[in-house]
Amino acid sequence: MRGLKKKRRIQIIAIAAVALTIATIMIGTAMRDGINFFRSPSEVAEAPPPESEVFRIGGLVEEGTLVRGESETTTFMVTDGGASIPVSYTGVLPDLFGENEGTVALGSMQNGVFMATEVLARHDETYMPKEVVDALKEQGVYKDPNATDADGGYGGASGS
């Protein structure tokens, strides 16, 4: 009788271990598909990711590059001061989206163009995502929006 209980206990522990392993693998796979890494334009230019990889790119919308087509397709360049990457987006852009403004886009590279499926703009005049601030600081082009310039005006990300 004792041998039977011990055998049954080992079977239950083995089944629980297998179930836990399967659950861990399933959760890990689901999380991996939901994680989108952030890259700056300089990082994308230095080491272009595979076309199948979905990631976020962030920086400033380069002045003079914003082109709104007749359809809902918009093209622009995202820069961090070190490199510029062409972006194409089909859809309605956020109200605060514009040239010299911070943006983060989700999508993938196709033939040297970042095809965005989602475009985010900062939600007020002073906010900029941490990743974008870090990338701009690394390139030496970040200006604190709360700091005043030599003329007494506020610098902002665009320097105006």
Curated annotation (Swiss-Prot):
One of its GO terms (biological process) is cytochrome complex assembly. Residues 31-160 are periplasmic. InterPro entries: CcmE, CcmE-like_sf, NA-bd_OB-fold. One of its GO terms (molecular function) is heme binding. Keywords: Cell inner membrane, Cell membrane, Cytochrome c-type biogenesis, Heme, Iron, Membrane, Metal-binding, Signal-anchor, Transmembrane, Transmembrane helix. The chain crosses the membrane at residues 10-30. It comes from Dinoroseobacter shibae (strain DSM 16493 / NCIMB 14021 / DFL 12). Heme chaperone required for the biogenesis of c-type cytochromes. Transiently binds heme delivered by CcmC and transfers the heme to apo-cytochromes in a process facilitated by CcmF and CcmH. GO terms for cellular component: plasma membrane. This is Cytochrome c-type biogenesis protein CcmE. Pfam families: CcmE (PF03100). It is a single-pass type II membrane protein. Residues 141-160 are annotated as: Disordered. It is found in: Cell inner membrane. HAMAP family: CcmE. Belongs to the CcmE/CycJ family. Disulfide bonds: none annotated. It comes from the Bacteria. The gene is ccmE. Residues 1-9 are cytoplasmic. Heme binds at residues 123, 127.
